[in-house]
């Protein structure tokens, strides 16, 4: 029986994780839940899964939750501190890190320091503070298991092989809703068009990141830290069908890939059950029905966010944290109709150019870089 705490339980990844848990009551139990936006849904989850500790966004949400639940309450915390308390709570042996954005960093660090294995869906944790997190994982002897479909695919394709035999890893990208759009059309696109992902059902922020290809850029940085790969050995290919989730090319010219239906429950189930496997509930793959798998080079002129992410990875220091924070601010501004779609990457670019990078050591230094970038990006947006 694996005891789990889920950070971001009411989001897309959290809901998919609970669906996997629901299928295997003999294998998984829920110890803690943390959410930020939907207290009513959290109340339903508490009734079903009976966690011993939960966290909500703020004190007002905590009072609302108490009212909704009545008697027989779990321990209730709130804020980022509360999420960290859930992450480090006794009784769990794995934490699913699925809070959106850099807000997931501090609770994930607390979970690692508490000796919890991490099922990582929050890619920003490694984008913002990859060196710090990697060092902590080694120091506390915990496992960091990828939940992103691409990184799960790489992880699976590396099993049983030597690191020195790897030529490169290849992340696949759907291309998003604007794969065939001109730059001029993207300049005019609003949130409604950008939120129409052709393959995946995800939250708003990651869907916009997929449309700009910033999501793939963040995944490149995440892959660097997860698999100890330099930028030169990380490739990206556009694969519109989203059936091949990523690949590993070896020095003998052979390529090993992981295929499956585009459903996040599969990589979640693999992370939760590793080194075993368990039923995920996804639709079985029928290649004859799919018929054709196609591939294209990514266009970094129309999608400069991907180039900016590679630039940030190569430059290192605080640039990845600044890239991520500026992007979070710009995506929020786009979703609120304050800027156009192509202004997202422009805002990130200008913020990175204005940044005087340094080499962070402590968590606070990473957080300071994040805060600086948010202020700078907001000033650029106006």
UniProtKB/Swiss-Prot annotation:
Superkingdom, taxonomy of origin: Bacteria
Broad EC category: oxidoreductase
A Pfam entry, by short name: DXP_reductoisom
Family stated for the protein in its record: Belongs to the DXR family.
Binding positions (Mn(2+)): 148, 150, 219
Assigned keywords, A-Z: Isoprene biosynthesis, Manganese, Metal-binding, NADP, Oxidoreductase
Function summary: Catalyzes the NADPH-dependent rearrangement and reduction of 1-deoxy-D-xylulose-5-phosphate (DXP) to 2-C-methyl-D-erythritol 4-phosphate (MEP).
EC number: 1.1.1.267
Protein name: 1-deoxy-D-xylulose 5-phosphate reductoisomerase
Residues binding NADPH: 10-13, 36, 122, 124, 203
Reported cofactor(s): Mg(2+); Mn(2+)
Organism: Chlorobium luteolum (strain DSM 273 / BCRC 81028 / 2530)
Record GO biological process: isopentenyl diphosphate biosynthetic process, methylerythritol 4-phosphate pathway involved in terpenoid biosynthetic process
Pathway listed: Isoprenoid biosynthesis; isopentenyl diphosphate biosynthesis via DXP pathway; isopentenyl diphosphate from 1-deoxy-D-xylulose 5-phosphate: step 1/6
Reactions it catalyzes: 2-C-methyl-D-erythritol 4-phosphate + NADP(+) = 1-deoxy-D-xylulose 5-phosphate + NADPH + H(+)
Positions that bind 1-deoxy-D-xylulose 5-phosphate: 123, 149-150, 174, 197, 210, 215-216, 219
Entry's Gene Ontology molecular function annotations: 1-deoxy-D-xylulose-5-phosphate reductoisomerase activity; manganese ion binding; NADPH binding
SUPFAM superfamilies: 1-deoxy-D-xylulose-5-phosphate reductoisomerase, C-terminal domain, Glyceraldehyde-3-phosphate dehydrogenase-like, C-terminal domain, NAD(P)-binding Rossmann-fold domains
């Amino acid at each position: 029986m694996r005891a789990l705490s889920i950070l971001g339980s009411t989001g897309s990844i959290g809901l998919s994780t609970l669906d996997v848990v629901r299928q295997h009551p003999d294998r998984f139990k829920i110890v803690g839940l943390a959410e930020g936006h939907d207290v009513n849904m959290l109340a339903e989850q508490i009734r079903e899964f009976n966690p011993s500790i939960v966290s909500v966004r703020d004190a007002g949400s905590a009072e609302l939750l108490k009212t909704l639940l009545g008697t027989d309450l779990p321990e209730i915390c709130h804020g980022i501190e509360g999420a960290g308390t859930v992450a480090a709570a006794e009784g769990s042996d794995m934490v699913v890190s699925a809070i959106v954005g850099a807000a997931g960093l501090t609770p994930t660090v607390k979970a690692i320091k508490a000796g919890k294995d991490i099922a990582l869906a929050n890619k920003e944790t490694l984008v913002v503070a990859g060196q710090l997190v990697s060092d902590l994982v080694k120091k506390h002897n915990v496992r960091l298991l990828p939940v992103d479909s691409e990184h799960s695919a790489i992880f699976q394709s590396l099993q049983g092989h030597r690191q020195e035999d790897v030529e490169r890893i290849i992340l696949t990208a759907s291309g998003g809703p604007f794969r065939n759009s001109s730059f001029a059309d993207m300049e005019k696109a609003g949130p409604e068009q950008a939120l129409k992902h052709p393959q995946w059902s995800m939250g708003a922020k990651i869907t916009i990141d997929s449309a700009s290809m910033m999501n793939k850029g963040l995944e490149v940085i995440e892959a660097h830290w997860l698999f100890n790969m330099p930028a030169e050995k990380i490739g990206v290919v556009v694969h519109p069908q989203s059936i091949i989730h990523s690949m590993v090319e070896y020095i003998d010219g052979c390529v090993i890939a992981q295929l499956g239906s585009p459903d996040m429950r599969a990589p979640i189930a693999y992370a939760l059950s590793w080194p075993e496997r368990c039923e995920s509930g996804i639709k079985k793959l029928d290649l004859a029905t799919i018929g054709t798998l196609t591939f294209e080079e990514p266009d970094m002129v129309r999608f400069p966010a991907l180039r900016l992410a590679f630039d940030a990875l190569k430059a290192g220091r605080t640039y990845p944290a600044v890239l991520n924070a500026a992007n979070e601010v710009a995506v929020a501004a786009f979703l609120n109709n304050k800027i156009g779609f192509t202004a997202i990457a422009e805002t990130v670019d200008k913020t990175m150019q204005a940044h005087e990078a340094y080499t962070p050591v402590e968590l606070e230094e990473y957080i300071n870089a994040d805060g600086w970038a948010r202020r700078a990006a907001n000033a650029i947006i106006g």
